[in-house]
UniProtKB/Swiss-Prot annotation:
GO molecular function, one term: small ribosomal subunit rRNA binding
UniProt keyword list: Ribonucleoprotein, Ribosomal protein, RNA-binding, rRNA-binding
Coiled coil listed as a keyword: no
UniProt record, GO biological process: translation
Entry similarity comment: Belongs to the bacterial ribosomal protein bS18 family.
HAMAP family: Ribosomal_bS18 (MF_00270)
Function: Binds as a heterodimer with protein bS6 to the central domain of the 16S rRNA, where it helps stabilize the platform of the 30S subunit.
InterPro entries assigned: Ribosomal_bS18, Ribosomal_bS18_CS, Ribosomal_bS18_sf
Name used for this protein in its record: Small ribosomal subunit protein bS18
Subunit description: Part of the 30S ribosomal subunit. Forms a tight heterodimer with protein bS6.
GO cellular component, one term: cytosolic small ribosomal subunit
Length: 72
């Protein structure tokens, strides 16, 4: 049986750019429903994924990005 390896998405963001005030960048790491995307989709390593999650949670807390999207 042939083995498959998933192609890992490369993250083209520096750790210094990830900040809770950078809303446009953080929206790339949040799904349409408002959930934080996993590192297998974002391509971030564990340390960077924790930094992304912390920044998203801070931005949500001060209402820069919504917790969930609004249903119509």
């Amino acid at each position: 049986m042939a083995e498959f390896r998933r192609r890992r998405a490369k993250l083209r963001v520096k750790a210094e750019e990830i900040d809770y005030k950078n809303v446009e960048l953080l929206k790339r790491f949040v799904s349409d429903k408002g959930k934080i995307n996993p590192s297998r989709l974002t391509g971030a390593n564990a340390k960077l994924q924790r930094k992304i999650a912390k920044a998203v949670k801070r931005a949500r807390n001060i209402a820069l990005i919504p917790y969930t999207r609004t249903e119509k």
